[in-house]
Amino acid sequence: MIWHVQNENFILDSTRIFMKAFHLLLFHGSFIFPECILIFGLILLLMIDSTSDQKDIPWLYFISSTSLVMSITALLFRWREEPMISFSGNFQTNNFNEIFQFLILLCSTLCIPLSVEYIECTEMAITEFLLFVLTATLGGMFLCGANDSITIFVAPECFSLCSYLLSGYTKRDVRSNEATTKYLLMGGASSSILVHGFSWLYGSSGGEIELQEIVNGLINTQMYNSPGISIALIFITVGIGFKLSPAPFHQWTPDVYEGSPTPVVAFLSVTSKVAASAPATRIFDIPFYFSSNEWHLLLEILAILSMILGNLIAITQTSMKRMLAYSSIGQIGYVIIGIIVGDSNDGYASMITYMLFYISMNLGTFARIVLFGLRTGTDNIRDYAGLYTKDPFLALSSALCLLSLGGLPPLAGFFGKLHLFWCGWQAGLYFLVSIGLLTSVVSIYYYLKIIKLLMTGRKQEITPHVRNYRRSPLRSNNSIELSMIVCVIASTIPGISMNPIIAIAQDTLF
């Protein structure tokens, strides 16, 4: 009898939960339609994997890519609509958030072709890999639209948990296991620090969790200049710092880049920074509106340390992936300049434009690392010597992406940095921009050093890896080369038409 009553209560509770979820989707589903497409894609992947055999593997890639492209399309159709707040204030839809969601979807769409041949060669489980990538993308999209402290804490956990699993996907590799352990420990510590900072905001604002309501609560309680807000600022900056990985919160980055599967590194190198930048800009601008001088100073210190340490340490690296890890630390220093400038002087527009170019430059470089690693089994920088003699297309594509990362004209990276630094200069960040210019020159040195190795024709300098280099049949690598071509074009052509891109970003944001 007791069991029967408990069973009925369980059914009633489950029914209420289901009806509430159905009600939320019915009345708020249009606000998260791009996210719903990804959820539907995840369900399809699970259904096909559980009911089919190995012959249906191409369908898994097709469904993953199609769901991402359809999500991008839904996002573009919703462009320029009026800002909307849904799910009782937990989620906000506006042009600013949608731009970051578009960048995350673009990253994932370009990363899936990079993983096709790699997964086949390493015999990794395909379905789980695609599920983790799509779920991480979904978490990043929810993070971009988060409008309260709880969602800002929960959404990155969805992204982070999938990132931990992806970084340790090659479980037989000792380096991958070590990278996952460090990533998990550092990620868990940063999450606890972040939520502790939110607890200070919650208490100081009188129990508010929505970002704008936190500001109103701080005004009502007269706590906007209290020591508690300073403590919250420090903890939240540290928590977000571990997600963005600027110096000195970069300790996990080189090991994770070196030990994780290369397609995973390509995915994490761009999506993690885009996903963390969106809430960072909103948190600093809204709840800490009255502490702008303090957080400007904190971010300036982080930017300077990142640009100097990242680019100087990158010079000494012998592994291509570790070099790109330290390079990414320097790159986030440039992005922080745009966060500091903010709405004034087109800071956000220049930051978003540079992020768009950075995605193409970085993914193009990682596409080359994936191809070279599969054909030679190494990512040592010295082993790239003489690659031009064996594979001119791969060498030239790599050179263009590296030159664009260094910021040489007339490539996209040059114009992206130029506009970003110009916005910083107009905002009075003279010292910060000067450091950025100097460290950009330093980065050009180690990028040119790699290009020199790629183009060398001296037989005594060509390594055995390149001598034995054999191109795979075009059928097996066309997806990687297709992604590389797209990234190379995006790293070069937009530099010529920079003004229209900046104008579109400015017109969309403001």
Curated annotation (Swiss-Prot):
GO terms for molecular function: NADH dehydrogenase (ubiquinone) activity; quinone binding. One of its GO terms (cellular component) is chloroplast thylakoid membrane. Its main location: plastid. Signal peptide: none annotated. Keywords: Chloroplast, Membrane, NAD, NADP, Plastid, Plastoquinone, Quinone, Thylakoid, Translocase, Transmembrane, Transmembrane helix, Transport. Pfam families: Ndh2_N, Proton_antipo_M. It comes from the Eukaryota. Its EC number is 7.1.1.-. It is found in: Plastid, Chloroplast thylakoid membrane. Disulfide bonds: none annotated. InterPro entries: NADH-Q_OxRdtase_suN/2, ND/Mrp_TM, Ndh2_N. GO terms for biological process: ATP synthesis coupled electron transport; photosynthesis, light reaction. It is a multi-pass membrane protein. The chain crosses the membrane at residues 24-44, 57-77, 99-119, 124-144, 150-170, 183-203, 229-249, 295-315, 323-343, 354-374, 395-415, 418-438, 484-504. Belongs to the complex I subunit 2 family. NDH shuttles electrons from NAD(P)H:plastoquinone, via FMN and iron-sulfur (Fe-S) centers, to quinones in the photosynthetic chain and possibly in a chloroplast respiratory chain. The immediate electron acceptor for the enzyme in this species is believed to be plastoquinone. Couples the redox reaction to proton translocation, and thus conserves the redox energy in a proton gradient. NDH is composed of at least 16 different subunits, 5 of which are encoded in the nucleus. This is NAD(P)H-quinone oxidoreductase subunit 2 A, chloroplastic.
